[in-house]
Amino acid sequence: MIVRSLHDIEATDHFVDWGNSTSHRLLTDKDGMGFSICHTIVRANTVSLLQYRNHLEACFCIGGEGEVEDMDGNVFPIRRGDMYVLDKHDKHLLRGGPDKDMILVSIFNPPLTGTERHKLDDPAGSTY
């Protein structure tokens, strides 16, 4: 059995602050489950161009608000209780809300190692 808290993760390299968000990588590749679970806080008033070329991601919003935009310009408001799935390695814009952070639980397949970091200075977007 694996039991971990957000507090436990903050003292490890599986707590990643990549500028526009923080991510607690609660379950990673080394745990052998075949997927990762992350608790991510997308900071209010931030925009990140992202793409997961090596992972599929499902996100469930547990608090706050924000939005995700696909590369066709479709904008999807995300609030508590909403889910979005990047099932085609979709490049996307991830935005925190205007007044509130967006809090997500994310599932990655295949799993993350836990130390991946977004690099937001690439005009083509951050990928891993």
Swiss-Prot record:
Please give the pathway this protein is involved in. Amine and polyamine biosynthesis; ectoine biosynthesis; L-ectoine from L-aspartate 4-semialdehyde: step 3/3
- Asked whether the UniProt record includes Magnesium among its keywords, one would answer no
Query: Which Gene3D superfamilies does the entry link to?
Result: Jelly Rolls
Q: Which SUPFAM superfamilies match?
A: RmlC-like cupins (SSF51182)
Q: Which reaction does it catalyse?
A: (2S)-4-acetamido-2-aminobutanoate = L-ectoine + H2O
Task: Output one GO BP term.
Answer: ectoine biosynthetic process
CDD domains reported for this sequence:
cupin_EctC
> GO molecular function: any one?
ectoine synthase activity
Which of UniProt's keywords are assigned here?
Lyase
- What does the record give as EC number? 4.2.1.108
The Swiss-Prot or TrEMBL record describes its family as follows: Belongs to the ectoine synthase family.
NCBIfam families cross-referenced by the UniProt entry: PRK13290.1
Q: What does this protein do?
A: Catalyzes the circularization of gamma-N-acetyl-alpha,gamma-diaminobutyric acid (ADABA) to ectoine (1,4,5,6-tetrahydro-2-methyl-4-pyrimidine carboxylic acid), which is an excellent osmoprotectant.
Name of this chain's protein: L-ectoine synthase
| Species lineage | Bacteria, Pseudomonadati, Pseudomonadota, Alphaproteobacteria, Hyphomicrobiales
| Gene that this polypeptide is encoded by | ectC
